[in-house]
Amino acid sequence: MEIEVKSQTDDEIVFIVRDAEVPFINAIRRCAMVNVPKIAIEDVNIMRNDSAMFNEVLAHRLGLTPLVSNMDAIEGLPLPGDDDYEENNSVMFSLKEEGPKVVYSKDLISSDSKIKPVYDTIPLVKLKEGEKLNIEAVAKVGYGKEHAKWMPTTVCVYKQYPEITFNEDVGIDYECADACPRGVLKSDKRSKEIKILDIEDCAMCKSCVRASIRNAQSEGKDESYINVGYHENDFIFRIETDGSMPPKEVLLQACDELGEKADKFIRFSEGGSK
């Protein structure tokens, strides 16, 4: 199996996996979505809320506000199923504001300087003149399989590597290139060919194939000039996070989690403990 990183930023990574199987790639995708630990606000104590927003809606917004959750930040915090949270192993947030103003995520005061909202400009609630807000909240580590707020990924998808072939026995069809909605194809009448600009951007929608078939049928032909398929064992994988942790860290933790599950299954099949 070969892996090639095509691009990487603070919140997105795109890489190619060659010589792999669909179940394996899909297992990594699922682990990245629901089995990587992340911290999010879970318990909210609203002592005063004079705004027009319902308490439940405000608590929901707080829970979905992404918090810095890299391994350095959440190290030492109990995972789900461990001991109950206490003052010395939990992260407390407080929010005390008075209108008129828009309360943003940056106004949340954390008991741990390493764990704070990823973005400062997420609007939480609007307070009018004289309205007050007083909240205390507890952030806990959890998994995406329990609630979406603990999912580190906003996008976690893969597709099989596209393959575009041309039927040289059929006359060249320049119009099929214009049918591509992503501009993957470009017709070059000077060199009498259709060029593939970026095959990895191909969505395999086959708009070009349908256009070529229509043109062929209008000329009394049976075959399409262009065909779109895919490599069964090559994949383009894309992970985008909400900023709570780097995408590469999400991928590594997902692989570790998958490896641990495989080890447990091996021990069980050999008659050992679960």
Curated annotation (Swiss-Prot):
Q: Which UniProt keywords apply?
A: 3Fe-4S, Cytoplasm, DNA-directed RNA polymerase, Iron, Iron-sulfur, Metal-binding, Nucleotidyltransferase, Transcription, Transferase
Tell me the domain of life. Answer: Archaea
The cross-references to InterPro entries, in alphabetical order and at most eight, read: DNA-dir_RNA_pol_insert, DNA-dir_RNA_pol_RpoA/D/Rpb3, RBP11-like, RNAP_Rpo3/Rpb3/RPAC1, RNApol_insert_sf, Rpo3/RPB3_RNA_Pol_subunit
Q: Which SUPFAM superfamilies match?
A: Insert subdomain of RNA polymerase alpha subunit, RBP11-like subunits of RNA polymerase
The cofactor remark states: Binds 1 [3Fe-4S] cluster.
Instruction: Kindly list the places in or outside the cell where this protein is found, as annotated in its UniProt entry.
Output: Cytoplasm
Keyword Nucleotidyltransferase tagged: yes
Give the reaction(s) catalysed: RNA(n) + a ribonucleoside 5'-triphosphate = RNA(n+1) + diphosphate
Membrane-crossing segments per the record: none
Q: What Pfam families has UniProt attached to this entry?
A: RNA_pol_A_bac (PF01000), RNA_pol_L (PF01193)
Q: What is its EC number?
A: 2.7.7.6
Q: Which residues bind [3Fe-4S] cluster?
A: 202, 205, 208
Report the cofactors: [3Fe-4S] cluster
GO terms for cellular component: cytoplasm; DNA-directed RNA polymerase complex
Stored CDD domains = RNAP_D
Protein family (similarity comment): Belongs to the archaeal Rpo3/eukaryotic RPB3 RNA polymerase subunit family.
What function does this protein fulfil?
A: DNA-dependent RNA polymerase (RNAP) catalyzes the transcription of DNA into RNA using the four ribonucleoside triphosphates as substrates.
Self-association and partners: Part of the RNA polymerase complex.
Q: Give the matching PANTHER family.
A: DNA-DIRECTED RNA POLYMERASE (PTHR11800), DNA-DIRECTED RNA POLYMERASE II SUBUNIT RPB3 (PTHR11800:SF2)
Q: What is this protein called?
A: DNA-directed RNA polymerase subunit Rpo3
Q: Which gene encodes it?
A: rpo3
